[in-house]
UniProtKB/Swiss-Prot annotation:
GO cellular component, as recorded: mitochondrial matrix
GO biological process: mitochondrial electron transport, succinate to ubiquinone; mitochondrial respiratory chain complex II assembly; protein-FAD linkage; tricarboxylic acid cycle
SUPFAM superfamilies tied to this protein: YgfY-like (SSF109910)
Role of this protein: Plays an essential role in the assembly of succinate dehydrogenase (SDH), an enzyme complex (also referred to as respiratory complex II) that is a component of both the tricarboxylic acid (TCA) cycle and the mitochondrial electron transport chain, and which couples the oxidation of succinate to fumarate with the reduction of ubiquinone (coenzyme Q) to ubiquinol. Required for flavinylation (covalent attachment of FAD) of the flavoprotein subunit of the SDH catalytic dimer.
Similarity section: Belongs to the SDHAF2 family.
Protein source organism: Lodderomyces elongisporus (strain ATCC 11503 / CBS 2605 / JCM 1781 / NBRC 1676 / NRRL YB-4239)
Family annotation (Pfam families): Sdh5
Intracellular or extracellular location(s): Mitochondrion matrix
Superkingdom in the source lineage: Eukaryota
Subunit structure: Interacts with the flavoprotein subunit within the SDH catalytic dimer.
Keywords: Chaperone, Mitochondrion
Chief subcellular location: mitochondrion
Name of this protein: Succinate dehydrogenase assembly factor 2, mitochondrial
Length: 164
């Protein structure tokens, strides 16, 4: 019985000693602030237009940041059904960007996150910026998910045909 108690107290003492010996020392290696790592988005080939729209609706709604979720889900509900395959591709590439970058670009907060040249002439980003202005001054909430809002029966229409 005595030996079990002795082993327990030795382990506790050793563990405590190790903690005290490392007290005040950094526990993690330093982070290199110049290191930039980006995971390439998945290349999707052979998607039908309806499957692509459905995926983009999901990606617009499930960003992880509430501000982006609200802005992009309302945008998707309003415009996704009318987008052509080329416009959907552009929107897909925009969704590959970081959430806060999209949010700051949509709200034209270029001091925080400068707008890259590749998005300066983007028709989709301009439309998103217009939507972000919220001229109707409505309270933003996640729109209801309805299949008819993003499935267009495989037809392509253009955003220029959308009547606001």
């Amino acid at each position: 019985m005595m030996s079990k108690n002795f082993r327990f107290s030795v382990r506790t003492f050793t563990n405590t000693t190790a903690r005290l010996a490392n007290y005040g020392k950094p526990q993690n290696p330093p982070i290199d602030p110049t290191l930039h790592m980006r995971i390439s988005p998945i290349e999707r080939t052979g998607e039908t237009i309806d499957v692509k729209r459905a995926r983009l609706v999901y990606q617009s709604r499930k960003r992880g940041i509430l501000e982006s979720d609200l802005l992009l889900s309302r945008f998707a509900k309003k415009y996704l059904k009318q987008m052509t395959m080329e416009e959907l591709d552009e929107y897909d590439k925009l969704l590959d960007e970081a959430d806060w970058d999209i949010y700051y670009w949509a709200t034209k907060n270029y001091d925080t996150t400068p707008l890259p040249k590749k998005w300066e002439d983007s028709k989709i980003l301009k439309l998103l910026q217009k939507e972000a202005e919220n001229e109707e001054r409505v309270i933003l909430r996640m729109p209801e998910l309805d299949e008819g809002d993003f499935i267009n029966g495989g037809k392509e229409t253009s955003l220029s045909e959308v009547k606001n």
